[in-house]
């Protein structure tokens, strides 16, 4: 699992959450197009985009969202994101592109926390055992090459659902292991 801030900078280009924040820090649609919150604040029903595919070419569905949530919450995964969702008592696919989250009590930050729910394909996790060396997401960029202690190269996702994005074909993150030379 990735915990270093510098790693999150890379990862946020490969994976996406259900929502994102705009420049004014307002929650906006991302993989989810809309949502309804019950009057008691315990149920969140989200509609998902139907035009999103993983980097491996498979369409993303609500089952992938549920799997990704359950994976984050699994103790054996040890995800640092689990605490963001501790108040959730259930996640279920209510349609091919619809998902419901049920909370034990109202929790105002929950919707924004969905920006950290990176959706992953079950078959890749099961084939690889984890996502330490293989990264298959829905983001604007795909993992192309990792040279340990040297660089990480990402290439544009040709199937990205946002028109005109990404604006560049490749991004390279150089590793600078010596802290005193990073500034």
Residue ranges and their predicted role:
Residues 33-78, 94, 100:
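Aromatic- and charge-enriched surface segment that lines or borders ligand/interaction sites
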Residues 1-39, 70, 136-138:
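N-terminal lobe/hinge region of extracytoplasmic solute-binding protein
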Residues 19-23, 40, 53, 70-77, ...:
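Sec-exported extracytoplasmic/periplasmic mature domains
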Residues 1, 33, 43-46, 65-68, ...:
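Short, well-ordered beta-strand elements
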Residues 68, 181-183:
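Short, hydrophobic alpha-helical packing/hinge segments within bilobed ligand-binding/sensory domains
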Residues 22, 26, 114-166, 170, ...:
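Gly/Pro-rich hinge or "lid" segments in bacterial periplasmic/extracellular proteins
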Residues 19, 33-36, 89-92, 142-144, ...:
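Conserved positions in beta-strands of structured domains
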Residues 47, 82-124, 145:
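Surface-exposed binding/hinge segments that line
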């Amino acid at each position: 699992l990735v915990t270093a801030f510098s790693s999150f900078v890379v990862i946020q280009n490969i994976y996406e959450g259900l929502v994102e924040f705009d420049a004014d820090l307002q929650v906006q649609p991302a993989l989810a197009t809309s949502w309804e919150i019950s009057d008691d604040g315990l149920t969140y029903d989200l509609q998902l985009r139907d035009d999103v595919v993983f980097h491996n070419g498979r369409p993303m569905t609500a089952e992938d969202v549920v799997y990704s949530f359950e994976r984050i919450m699994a103790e054996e995964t040890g995800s640092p994101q689990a605490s963001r969702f501790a108040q959730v008592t259930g996640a279920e696919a209510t349609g091919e592109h619809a998902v419901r989250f049920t909370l034990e009590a109202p929790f105002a930050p929950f919707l924004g926390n969905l920006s950290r729910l990176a959706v992953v394909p079950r078959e890749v996790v099961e084939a690889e055992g984890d996502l330490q060396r293989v990264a298959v997401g829905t983001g604007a960029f795909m993992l192309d090459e990792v040279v340990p202690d040297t660089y990480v190269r990402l290439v544009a996702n040709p199937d990205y659902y946002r028109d005109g994005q990404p604006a560049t074909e490749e991004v390279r993150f150089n590793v600078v292991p010596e802290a005193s030379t990073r500034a």
